Amino acid sequence: LGTRLITGFGKQLRFGGEVMKNVAGYDLSRLMAGSFGCLGVITEVSLKVLPKPRQSLSLRLPLDAEHALAKLAEWGQQPLPISAASHDGQALHLRLEGGEGSVAAARERLGGEPLDPLYWQQLNEQELPFFRDPRPLWRLSLANNSPLLALPGEQLIDWGGAQRWLKSSASAEAIRTAVAAVGGHASCYAADHCDSPFQPLAAPLLHYHRQLKAQLDPQGIFNPGRMYAEV
């Protein structure tokens, strides 16, 4: 909801607030979450928290990736208590959360077999067998209704299709071109496999990045070159 940070000028600024629909200051707090420490030192964060669901149930459904994406698009238009969805290349994994009645009704409708909830922690910590593949790791960010990309290697679908992990030896150019064709971008998690970890920016976007950096950190003190060499 809000942040406090120290800028390159040595000033402490506050963006956002501590309640929903707060209009105090410019809404730059969201930018800080993905800035990798390039815009300032975060000293305080205000977060929105939610109560723990009364019921949680994880399921495994034997669907291939293409059919899983189609089902997720269909279920996304329906009032189902799906809080997480992932496909590990073998099956679709779902987490249902909410009231006892709604979770039970969804289980009856969707079918599947029980899944150890530890799966979600292992996915979050990248401890699943998929991540042991020695090939370079890529994070693909794209619309959740994007089709399965025809890229060499293995893919793991997360966030209901909006985040996809790729293990592939394909070139950075080939991967980023394929992802850009569906309106997404690709980040490389193998430092020795690509020149920059992030998708190259178009000239107008790079201009905005430079201007924002100049406003908060004109001396280039904070993490210079971490995101882009030009910033």
What are these regions (language model features)?
Residues 6, 44, 95-97, 166-168:
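Short beta-strand-to-turn element immediately C-terminal to the catalytic PLP-Schiff-base lysine
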Residues 89, 113-231:
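Conserved glycine-rich FAD pyrophosphate-binding loop
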Residues 24-26, 105, 176:
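A short, polar/proline- and glycine-enriched secondary-structure boundary/capping micro-motif
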Residues 2, 84-86, 154-156:
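Short, surface-exposed charged micro-motifs
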Residues 14, 103-105, 224:
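Short helix/loop capping segments that flank catalytic or ligand/cofactor-binding pockets
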Residues 1-81:
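FAD-binding subdomain of flavoenzyme oxidoreductases
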